[in-house]
């Protein structure tokens, strides 16, 4: 600031100069001479010869009344009229003359008369480094809590250096320590101030106080400095320090704002209660000089108001530092900065006019598409009338200026209606005044839709499970599909397509609602007819071009118990009579009832029971096998004709059933009848008969030939069957010849007793000893069957047939799991135990496999090709006493018939796999050999 006396002198000088200029305007224009001298020159220091420099005559100076007419500045310089030299007359202190102005100039006015002339002399006072930096206090004390986090800043006292330029204050230095670092900041007026930054957490117990030294350095040569001792006391303070809601506040005030005008209110909060939460506001310690004279701060409310007179030409921006402390015992301070901008009055805001708007805009509009034209006007002049426009950042639009105050709104990025269907653009126009005034207008831009999204679904495929015999027309699936496009492009149409080579499935079985995607069945579905459907749902939208999506729909039909069991044997409507000799012991196998069910799983599991007979105590039936046997010995008092009604029930819910009727004829006990049911241990009386030896020789020769032929056939068939599926293997010759393996399979199926094989049979009407023998030792086709099973599925082979993994062509010992126990084997009098408590198969797969194999053997017997010693369809029994088991083929019965299990479960085959010989296997072989010898 220029001293008031110096300003008054300048004003007086200006008035004199103005008068002289008016008087001498007609004579001669004034001349300006420039000099530069350092400050603090001693009195009498020669500045320059002004007379010579002005071209005046030295001898006429007195006559022309040469004099210095400047006001306050004339005391600093004098002119020697004898020599014309101008010299320093008083101490020149640049800091006193010009303060902090970057340039300091003293102007002198010289006047001569006759004629009147006015001359101006400007002397630039150059700064020298003659002032040390100085701190306003001798020392500084800080109280810092040990809980202060590293990185916290603490403002320090600012030093002041009256010099300017490089001679002014340039930097600060801090003595070395392990806790604090110094950060030197620059104000907007280029002055420096220092902050103390905590780099390492304090520990009051370790160091309760710290002594630091702050040094201020200027840029002169040599550099001058000043030091400020800093005493830091480490305190245990309250938990929470005040916190400003923002670290930087900005305010703008007019330079003619009166005293008391509110500038801004700072706000700090403290989470503590009581005195520790009461905040006191104060100015920071490093504010520039003059801030406290121009502004006032309310200690309680934090309101900053104007106190003095603001001068825009002096300072345009005030940087004020405010600290807040609580009233706790160890208060911690928070600091914020307030920027107060002093501006000239700018009382006209811009005005925005939207001349045209192109809306809606297609979402596929190219970049640079013009959306709107805007014109902006401002009644102010100069910089206050220069206007700029802008749109918020992050939007796909931009403003460009084509002419002055005219702007074009264009697209700058791709539009997406599905993301943002409409924009309300806030266009802001600002002038260049200080403070800048602005205007805001809203431009509404709608985005129109194009068909750029296909129908979408949460699932790419659906698996639907529906129970058979469903209600036609009932919904079975509702497709969840949507299209994010606009309604006109999102109108969906649903169609069903067929997969694979099958056609007609859609029209026969299913339909879909074209509008809502609900799939319905046209007819009741039948599990036994078809179990799975593969469809494709085709969904298209209503846009142009049409976009579509395909969804796979797999429909699985589940089974219901809708089929009652059917009787395979005895044949319904036929006459089946089973022969039973009198005197037969308990447990004798009389016959077997065979049923099947077209359902699957538990719905196809069958159980057998007797409904009624003339003598309830004579017969018993296996619950799961259907085997009918004698429950007690046949007595003479029993009726010669017994009619049995067997109830066959499945395991479904609700259970369905059917009945089968079987007639048993009780015959007189005779030698012929006993010959047909001989005892395994009874000696044969005809061993020495010549006919027996002749037949035996013939059989041995025949067997040798048959074995050779079958060996070749089995080898060829074995090679061919290795690549075939198990279910496609031929089964017509499965039980044609007896043998150990055939014996095991027959017993496993529960069809007959093993003692019905390798026996000598006589017909009831025979009058001579003509034994009928089966062909012993013939090569069994079952070996080829077993090799095929082993190659297709070794695990199933071992479980079902109980065979070892023997080399092809080698018969494994029979699995005793499928044999009857000794007590259950019928002898000559049929002593088999009739109480069969066999277990169910483990799963549906095992059930259906056993059904297919055993029914294949039953079909073999029905064809009349069995060589088990009986007549056509007798399953190996004699023509007189065997059941007439002629089967009728039922479509698909091989896949659905369930023949319940035997006396052993499939899991017992583990002993076979473990390498243990099945119990009773060798005994059966020995018994068979004894029979053949006899």
Swiss-Prot record:
A single MF term (Gene Ontology): calcium ion binding
Biased composition (Basic residues): 924-934
Domain of life: Eukaryota
CDD domains: Cadherin_repeat
Cellular localization per UniProt: Cell membrane
Disordered, as annotated region: 804-843, 904-934
Ranges in the topological domain labelled Extracellular: 32-693
Gene Ontology BP term (one): nervous system development
Principal place of residence: membrane
GO CC terms: plasma membrane
Residues spanning the signal sequence: 1-31
Keyword check for Signal: yes
UniProt source species: Pan troglodytes (Chimpanzee)
TM region positions: 694-714
Function: Potential calcium-dependent cell-adhesion protein. May be involved in the establishment and maintenance of specific neuronal connections in the brain.
Keyword annotations of the record: Calcium, Cell adhesion, Cell membrane, Glycoprotein, Membrane, Repeat, Signal, Transmembrane, Transmembrane helix
Ranges of Polar residues composition bias in the record: 812-843
PROSITE patterns: CADHERIN_1, CADHERIN_2
Glycosylation sites recorded in the entry for this protein: 245, 424, 478, 550, 615, 689
Stated name of the protein: Protocadherin gamma-C3
């Amino acid at each position: 600031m220029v001293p008031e006396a110096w300003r008054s002198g300048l004003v007086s000088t200006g008035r004199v100069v103005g008068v002289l200029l008016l008087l001498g305007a007609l004579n001669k224009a004034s001349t300006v001479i420039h000099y530069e001298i350092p400050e603090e020159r001693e009195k009498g220091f020669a500045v320059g010869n002004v007379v010579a420099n002005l071209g005046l005559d030295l001898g006429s100076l007195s006559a022309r009344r040469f004099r210095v007419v400047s006001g306050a500045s004339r005391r600093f310089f004098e002119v020697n009229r004898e020599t014309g030299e101008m010299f320093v007359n008083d101490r020149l202190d640049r800091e006193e003359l010009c303060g902090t102005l970057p340039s300091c100039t003293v102007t002198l006015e010289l006047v001569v008369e006759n004629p009147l002339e006015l001359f101006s002399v400007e002397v630039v006072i150059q700064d020298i480094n003659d002032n040390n930096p100085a701190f306003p206090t001798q020392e500084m004390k800080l109280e810092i809590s040990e809980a202060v986090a590293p990185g916290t800043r603490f403002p320090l006292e600012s030093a002041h250096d009256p010099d300017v330029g490089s001679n002014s204050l340039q930097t600060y230095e801090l003595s070395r320590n392990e806790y604090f670092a110094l950060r030197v900041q620059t104000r907007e007026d280029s002055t420096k101030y220092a902050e103390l930054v905590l780099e390492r957490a304090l520990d009051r117990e370790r160091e309760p106080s710290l002594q630091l030294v702050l040094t201020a350095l200027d840029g002169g040569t040599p550099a001058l400095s000043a030091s400020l001792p800093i005493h830091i006391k480490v305190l245990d303070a309250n938990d929470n320090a005040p916190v400003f809601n923002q670290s930087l506040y900005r305010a703008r005030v007019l330079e003619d704002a009166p005293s008391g005008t509110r500038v801004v209110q700072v706000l700090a909060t403290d989470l503590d209660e009581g005195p520790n939460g009461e905040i006191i506001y104060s100015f920071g310690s490093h504010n520039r000089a003059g801030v406290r004279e121009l502004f006032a701060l309310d200690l309680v409310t934090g309101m900053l108001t104007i106190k003095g007179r603001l001068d825009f030409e002096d300072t345009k921006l005030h940087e004020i530092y405010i600290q807040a402390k609580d009233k706790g015992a160890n208060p911690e301070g928070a600091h914020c900065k307030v920027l107060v901008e002093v501006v000239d009055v700018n009382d006209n805001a811009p005005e925005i006019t939207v001349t045209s708007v192109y809306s809606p805009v297609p979402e596929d509009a190219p970049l640079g598409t013009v959306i709107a034209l805007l014109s902006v006007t401002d009644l102010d002049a100069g910089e206050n009338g220069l206007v700029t426009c802008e749109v918020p950042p992050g939007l796909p639009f931009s403003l460009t200026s084509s002419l002055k105050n005219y702007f074009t709104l264009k697209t700058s990025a791709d539009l997406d209606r599905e993301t943002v269907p409409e924009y309300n653009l806030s266009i802001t126009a600002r002038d260049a005044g200080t403070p800048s005034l602005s205007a805001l207008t809203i431009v509404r831009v709608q985005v129109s839709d194009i068909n750029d999204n296909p129908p979408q679904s949460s699932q790419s495929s659906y698996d639907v499970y529906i129970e058979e015999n469903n209600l036609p027309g009932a919904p079975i699936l509702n497709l969840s599909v949507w299209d994010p496009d606009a309604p006109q492009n999102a109108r969906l149409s649903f169609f069903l397509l067929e997969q694979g080579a099958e056609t007609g499935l859609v029209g026969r079985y299913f339909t879909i609602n074209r509008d809502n995607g609900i799939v319905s069945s046209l007819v009741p579905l039948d599990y036994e007819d078809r179990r799975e459907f593969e469809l494709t749902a085709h969904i298209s939208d209503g846009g142009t071009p049409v976009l579509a999506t395909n969804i796979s729909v797999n429909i699985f039909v589940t089974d219901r118990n809708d089929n009652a069991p059917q009787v395979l044997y005895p044949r319904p409507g036929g006459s089946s009579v089973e022969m039973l000799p009198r005197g037969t012991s308990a447990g004798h196998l009389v016959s077997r009832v065979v049923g099947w069910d077209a359902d699957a799983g538990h719905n196809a599991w069958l159980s057998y029971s007797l409904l009624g007979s003339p003598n309830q105590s004579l017969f018993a039936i296996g619950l799961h096998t259907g085997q009918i046997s004698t429950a007690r010995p046949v007595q003479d008092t029993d009726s010669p004709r017994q009619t049995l009604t067997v109830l066959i029930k499945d395991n479904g819910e609700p259970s369905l059933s059917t009945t089968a009727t079987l007639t048993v004829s009780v015959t007189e006990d005779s030698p012929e009848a006993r010959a047909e049911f001989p005892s395994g241990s009874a000696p044969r009386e005809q061993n020495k008969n010549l006919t027996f030896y002749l037949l035996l020789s013939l059989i041995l020769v025949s067997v040798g030939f048959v074995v050779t032929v079958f060996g070749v056939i089995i080898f060829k068939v074995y090679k061919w069957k290795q690549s075939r599926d198990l279910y496609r293997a031929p089964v017509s010759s499965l039980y044609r010849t007896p043998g150990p393996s055939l014996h095991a399979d027959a017993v496993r199926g529960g069809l007959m007793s093993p003692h019905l094989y390798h026996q000598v049979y006589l017909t009831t009407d025979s009058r001579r000893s003509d034994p009928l023998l089966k062909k012993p030792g013939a090569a069994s086709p079952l070996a080829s069957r077993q090799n095929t099973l082993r190659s297709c599925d070794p695990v199933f082979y071992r479980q079902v047939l109980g065979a070892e993994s023997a080399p092809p062509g080698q018969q494994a010992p029979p699995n005793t799991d499928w044999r009857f126990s000794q007590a259950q084997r019928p002898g000559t009098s049929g002593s088999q135990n009739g109480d069969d408590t066999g277990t169910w198969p483990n799963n549906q797969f095992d059930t259906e496999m056993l059904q297919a194999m055993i029914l294949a053997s039953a079909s073999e017997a029905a064809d009349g090709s069995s060589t088990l010693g009986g007549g056509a369809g007798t399953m190996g029994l004699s023509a007189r006493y065997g059941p007439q088991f002629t089967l009728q083929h039922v479509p698909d019965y091989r896949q659905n018939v369930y023949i319940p299990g035997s006396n052993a479960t499939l899991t017992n085959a583990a002993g076979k796999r473990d390498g243990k010989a099945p119990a009773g296997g060798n005994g059966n072989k020995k018994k068979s050999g004894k029979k053949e010898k006899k």
